[in-house]
């Protein structure tokens, strides 16, 4: 930990400079991504376009500016993702001087695990859930109604689902953090499972569109992830490990 204390104004000046670097990197990344916005858009919305293609349909733009501004949003999203290393580096450079060595060592595993879980959730949603969700929506076509999905709305829905599944997969890390900090114990986590399930379904309803299919496909993995997090918390439970070590020492003392 750096013992040199800086005035609050210097901290704010440094923070402003680092935010400028992050925003500049995002703008550059978005500018480069705009050249490939059509390809990026096509990849992100492949599950939706595949569902529409089954009935011979395709995405529509109902406003003169819709295609252009949707591609800009797509480029900004891509620029944000591509420049995440710059964002993390600037965050680290800002907070590292105020951390102890033990805290610095814990940051890297935390960043790696949280990034991996978020990416895993996004990939799971994209590859497994998105096709089912869009097929479900498209299945309501009939002789009186034909689906006419706009690219703006489908892009918005897709990004919301990406965010929902990415955040949902952070649940084991959050549960583990609560355990190792002593806020809750593994026993309390397992005992509170019914309440956790209720909260998960409420959160799932808030993060997803108002249909039961996408809510279920988000809530069920979240319940499993909660139980996985509680299991990991049980394995690393400080009280359990301390009791186990005390019992081992007692057995050694008896054998002597």
Task: Identify the function of each model-found stretch.
Residues 1-256:
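Membrane topogenic/interface segments and analogous intrinsically disordered interaction regions
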């Amino acid at each position: 930990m750096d013992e040199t204390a800086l005035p609050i104004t210097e901290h704010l000046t440094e923070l402003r400079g680092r935010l400028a670097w992050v925003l500049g990197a995002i703008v550059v990344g978005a500018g480069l991504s705009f050249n490939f916005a059509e390809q990026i858009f096509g990849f992100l919305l492949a599950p939706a376009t595949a569902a529409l293609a089954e009935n011979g349909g395709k995405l529509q733009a109902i406003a003169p500016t819709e295609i252009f501004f949707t591609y800009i949003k797509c480029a900004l999203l891509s620029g944000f993702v591509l420049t995440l290393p710059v964002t993390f580096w600037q965050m680290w450079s800002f907070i590292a001087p105020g951390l102890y060595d033990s805290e610095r060592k814990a940051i890297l595993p935390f960043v790696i695990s949280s990034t991996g879980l978020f990416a895993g959730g996004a990939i799971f949603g994209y590859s497994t859930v998105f096709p089912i969700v869009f097929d479900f929506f498209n299945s309501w076509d009939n002789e009186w109604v034909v689906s006419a999905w706009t690219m703006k709305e489908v892009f918005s829905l897709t990004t919301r689902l990406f965010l929902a599944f990415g955040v949902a997969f952070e649940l084991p890390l959050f549960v583990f953090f609560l355990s190792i900090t002593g806020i809750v114990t593994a026993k309390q986590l397992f005992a509170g499972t019914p309440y956790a399930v209720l909260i998960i379904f409420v959160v799932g309803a808030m993060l997803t569109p108002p249909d039961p299919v996408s809510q279920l496909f988000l809530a069920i993995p979240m319940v499993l992830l909660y139980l996985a997090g509680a299991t990991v918390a049980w394995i690393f439970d400080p009280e359990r490990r301390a009791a186990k070590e005390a019992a081992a020492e007692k057995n050694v003392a008896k054998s002597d």
